[in-house]
Design a protein with these regions (language model features):
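Class I S-adenosyl-L-methionine
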Residues: 1-98
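A polyampholytic, Gly/Pro-enriched intrinsically disordered region
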Residues: 56-64, 113-128, 186-190
């Protein structure tokens, strides 16, 4: 799920920090001798994702005062910590986002042709989708449904907007496996 440019940046980084060691390339880079750390301990310390993202960004900017930092995430376009990095960016600091294959790209690539979106598609992480304004006229791709509790909250929210029986395509573990998308009713999501 990486471009050659992103992989090269990770291998050459003086300070490589993964949002999570669950990142698909973390183990491969570690086995190749690339030194890195992860921010997995933040998940145990925080219940509020917004607060966690703010503190991740603060820690990353503090680290960047001493070293050039490469921060590896699954999908920079939807990642809350990356949003906070942008929001907290010091005036004299440089922030470069390198392109990669997003979670949405991985999911869309697995969809049958008749379901592949043409035109507008709204991509949003699950933690934001629970409270985001709904637009039933735009196809919605929700990423990062990390646990059953979040899936349940999301299902209840979406059922309020779209109804229980909305045909839904569930793409599980698209970044780690080749599991095929499943056609389900929205009510069965969690």
């Amino acid at each position: 799920l990486l471009t050659a440019q992103s992989m090269n940046a990770m291998k050459k980084a003086k300070r490589l920090i993964f949002r999570t060691a669950q990142h698909p390339v973390y183990a491969a880079l570690t086995e190749a001798g690339v030194q890195s750390t992860s921010l997995d301990d933040y998940y145990d310390r925080y219940e509020d994702f917004d607060e966690m993202h703010r503190d991740m960004a603060k820690a990353l900017w503090a680290e960047a005062e001493h070293h050039a930092v490469v921060f590896a995430v699954l999908d920079a376009g939807t990642d809350g910590a990356v949003r906070e990095l942008r929001a907290q960016q010091p005036q004299d600091a440089v922030l470069r986002i390198l392109p990669g294959v997003t979670l949405a790209d991985a999911c869309i690539a697995q969809l049958p042709g008749n379901l592949a979106p043409i035109g507008a598609l709204r991509t949003i992480p699950a933690e934001d989708a629970v409270t985001a304004a709904a637009d039933p006229t735009t196809p919605l791709l929700i990423t990062e449904i990390w646990n059953r509790s979040l899936a349940c909250d999301l299902k209840l929210r979406l059922c309020d907007v779209y109804g229980d029986e909305l045909p839904t395509v569930l793409c599980l573990a698209t970044v780690k496996t080749n599991r095929k998308p499943q056609n389900i009713q929205l009510w069965d999501m969690d």
